[in-house]
């Protein structure tokens, strides 16, 4: 009695991004990025550090929401076992994989945070509104939460891409099962991290203002982006 074996077909090479395939385009992209960065730094001297940091924060949030939105759709598609999404899932996984780089662009915000978030410069006992929020709005705790957000987003995006590409080579259906389990536990954590990131990085700019829907707005906006 023979045992039939099945070897999954190799995924096309286009499925895997290699920067070496870009050729001269790579140098053009790197050059354009460096020139853009130099222009941004020049803006800090022309318009002042504070204006530069607010503009940097705007740009960071723009790309952050696109990246986190891609991760959301990957998680949702696995959670509901959506078969049709396989044609776009690799693209979403690749965009979500940018979390291994995007944290670098948060460093200027982290380093010069007191220039953006005025509450970091106010001593306890000066503003009763701020004192009532000190449990959340303390510099060290704010930075710790940022590290937790990036750690979760990076880990989740890495695991999805790892299991997905592993399934390309092995054909193991268990990879899909692991991704589904990851989604069931990860979606609540995703909602919490995305909501509090929006509160920490945007709403706390004006700590007197509050909104029960701001986190939902950021969450939904990320998915839409």
List each model region and its residues.
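Long, contiguous internal "core" modules enriched in hydrophobic/ aromatic residues
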Residues: 20-36, 40-41, 139-225
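Transmembrane-helix bundle segments that line or gate the permeation/cavity pathway
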Residues: 2, 61-169, 186
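Short, charged cytosolic
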Residues: 1-8
